[in-house]
From Swiss-Prot:
Residues 5-65 form the v-SNARE coiled-coil homology domain. Induction: During myogenesis. May participate in trafficking events that are associated with myogenesis, such as myoblast fusion and/or GLUT4 trafficking. Keywords: Cell membrane, Coiled coil, Developmental protein, Differentiation, Golgi apparatus, Membrane, Myogenesis, Phosphoprotein, Transmembrane, Transmembrane helix. The gene is VAMP5. The keyword Transmembrane helix applies. It comes from Homo sapiens (Human). The modification Phosphoserine is found at residues 41, 48-49. The chain crosses the membrane at residues 73-93. Residues 94-116 are vesicular. This is Vesicle-associated membrane protein 5. Gene3D superfamilies: 1.20.5.110. The keyword Phosphoprotein applies.
Amino acid sequence: MAGIELERCQQQANEVTEIMRNNFGKVLERGVKLAELQQRSDQLLDMSSTFNKTTQNLAQKKCWENIRYRICVGLVVVGVLLIILIVLLVVFLPQSSDSSSAPRTQDAGIASGPGN
């Protein structure tokens, strides 16, 4: 009887030992997986930092391009308005040689007319 009970205790001890070995192996695998996960998370953190810097640089570059574009468009609009203004001034303002000689001719004609 003592031999049977001793064998049963030995068998239970062997089962517990096997379970403990399996658990220890699983703990080691878990540690390896956690280390890999930590490494990947560090890589993702570095990549996100790089991505953030890249997007900020790109946003700043696009902002300056937009400012340059608006300045160019503004200069073109001002240039076109100046050309239109110059054309209108030339067309609608009488020229000094034509305007000064035309009234003198009329005044001279009136003064030397038949009534004098």
